[in-house]
């Protein structure tokens, strides 16, 4: 995939000042962002996360998923580490888009789980692609990662591109009564690696 680097600016956040790097897919015009913190070292594994856009969770504070909680936890961990990165990929609704995601939520309100809802709309359970990762990481100077994720597909995608995943760090935050069924489906049907933390009351 051809991805064009556009520009870099400062991004002040509650956890510190990140650098925000803009990218554009040349074939589609789709825009993605890389956040970096501190001085990245291409010879060492960098703490990082690959985060797919979730307007409802990231910006509207939805409790239906754990996305917003994961985004904030990842940014805080990177800042506390003193260096790291976060790739923010514009793949709303596991790749089906915002309006289709709302349609899927409507089906979930009627009893479907997150996978069933996507499939009833004619989509695969997870439509996301990760081809844009390699040129983005190359631009910011990352070749080895300590990846914050519960999703084995992200680990496999990076390894298939020749990026060394030195460690997978679980990111288990944000469980609540509205998303417990969703989290169980991600574990049982999408293969996400989660501990019993998600499935028992604290």
Curated annotation (Swiss-Prot):
InterPro entries, per this entry?
GTP_cyclohydro_II (IPR032677), RibA (IPR000926), RibA-like_sf (IPR036144)
Name it. Answer: GTP cyclohydrolase-2
Protein's job? Catalyzes the conversion of GTP to 2,5-diamino-6-ribosylamino-4(3H)-pyrimidinone 5'-phosphate (DARP), formate and pyrophosphate.
For this record, the Gene Ontology CC terms, alphabetical, are: cytosol
What are the binding positions for GTP in this chain? Answer: 49-53, 70, 92-94, 114, 149, 154
Q: Which PANTHER family match?
A: 3,4-DIHYDROXY-2-BUTANONE 4-PHOSPHATE SYNTHASE, GTP CYCLOHYDROLASE II-RELATED
Report whether Phosphoprotein shows up as a keyword of the record.
no
């Amino acid at each position: 995939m051809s991805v064009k680097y556009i520009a870099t600016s400062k991004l002040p956040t509650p956890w510190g000042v990140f650098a925000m790097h803009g990218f554009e897919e040349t074939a589609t015009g789709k825009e993605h962002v890389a956040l970096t913190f501190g001085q990245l070292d291409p010879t060492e594994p960098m703490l990082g996360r690959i985060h797919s856009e979730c307007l409802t969770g990231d910006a509207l504070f939805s409790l239906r998923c754990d996305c917003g909680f994961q985004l904030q936890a990842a940014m805080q961990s990177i800042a506390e580490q003193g260096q790291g990165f976060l790739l923010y990929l514009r793949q709303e609704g596991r790749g089906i888009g915002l309006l289709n995601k709302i349609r899927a939520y409507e089906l979930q309100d009627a009893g479907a789980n997150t996978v069933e809802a996507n499939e009833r709309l004619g989509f695969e359970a997870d439509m996301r692609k990760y081809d844009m990762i390699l040129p983005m990481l190359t631009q910011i100077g990352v070749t080895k990662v300590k990846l914050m994720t519960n999703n084995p597909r992200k680990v496999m995608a990076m390894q298939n591109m020749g990026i060394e995943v030195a460690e997978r760090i679980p990111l288990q935050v944000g469980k609540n009564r509205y998303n417990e069924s969703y989290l169980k489906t991600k574990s049982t049907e999408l293969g996400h690696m989660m501990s019993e933390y998600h499935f028992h009351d604290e």
